[in-house]
């Protein structure tokens, strides 16, 4: 029987699939299900009730609450939703319950089809310590575990890892023996929070290693495909940021691909694997590699493999779960190159601080597909949120900070990288901060373009790509002027005397000052820019402004001339002459004061500020406020403690990651306003440090 005939014969096996997940992966699975004529069921938390994935499913079942533990990690609630909606199969996506063997057994025991590997295979790989023993016995190269009591200075750095972990959570690099205990404790806390299992182990940390992984697809009849490799060496906090297929390293080292595929197939056979999975390795530049783990699920980065093979990996998951054989002895050959960038709601310049709030606009050019392909050169966009005029997307604090995956495919690596860089640079990403600038800087970096990368790329060797924005100071000033011109046009259009220009005088020039903060939010003066719009009544030169560094900017035209309505989402086009060169900028104004300015100079997000600062917004010296909403997981000081600049005061967990709050000055802790377990919002007072320098200044003032 051919594969097509098998599919026709087995179609009744799966008729309605529930996806026990959220966001872009739920939308990805729904796409394949719809292509196959299957009915779809979503489950959603209260926070997700208006998300696209919940609207797109044929049926959606509420999981009361917001926290993962009461919603997407609540196995009983998910199974009850499947029963109520009449689902006969469950796809777990990735994360949440996808690698929970107990949940897989419960699905099967309920008479439903589990679209994933067997519970036994998940169990075998669920503990990284036990998995390493199995892999070593199967002949797969491994790194040995280290005993805490035996670790010496000469063995550093070492890596603390969660045995049940993944996604970078529960991982800590230790570089000094003094840090070993505290970093191990932090890894245990993260592991318990993310996976419900605080077991950790320690192994040697390879500083300049490269993360290489092999995509597996196996059926229940002994067939195993090593579909292709991916390189995921660009990471922050041990989480992948940019992935690509194939790997530049594997392409360069003779015979490495064959050895990788042989090891991956051996791993699959050792545990009787079926379905989609990934064998991850740590490699050096010589092509030597060591086993890291088997992810017993679909990976976030699976689109780059789909783009380079033409396969629908989710469709193959359905087929394997329905009992089909793999359609051929070997997978398709690799074709071209694909690169994926993960767009996160976070601030790389401030220790990857997660951002919550509103995404006002999220538009990309050159998108040829979403959740499939691409099968032609172009951009694939797999996004969780969607925006529309007057309907921003809201990013909360309960779930992962990833907004979307942007994937490019082209015949060559150079073309794929260039295409992705251009798409990200031109994208209209307005609202809360993202890592878009960092992604473009990485893709444009000479070493990245040459394939000279490793897992320390962001944290050690190329830190500047995370700290330097795409738009320089002059570009920010030019963009702010364009925003001010549109603001002036809006003001003119709403006055009764609209045909008399704002600030017009019979003699001399009229000057209007507009104030902006760079970024989304109220910000502060240090991150602000003031723009003077000068109109002359004595010439036809129109509005003009002279910026710093003696650059001259003159308005040529603004369309529409009477401004834009903030609520409609319609942009204004501003043509400026910058040092004699014409530039076209697109300006979107939003309710609440947000302004997105996009041009070939670079993207700039601004927030309108009042002409004069509100004294109530000024934070007292020595006061530390929460930079993000989250939960206080530990407090390391007490009132009266002497602290030094940079000393850890407490940690906050937000979006599944821990973030350290450190002292900003030397001094004495005079107040602690937060305790372990407190739920806090952005701007909440956490602590106050009395600085000797501040006291001296006060005394001098009093005298």
Model-derived regions: residue spans:
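Catalytic P-loop NTP-binding/switch module of NTPases
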Residues: 582, 586-626
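N-terminal beta-alpha lobe that positions the nucleotide/phosphoryl donor
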Residues: 1-279, 283-302
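Catalytic cores of soluble metabolic enzymes centered on carboxylation/carboxyl-transfer
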Residues: 303-306, 311-552, 645, 678-703
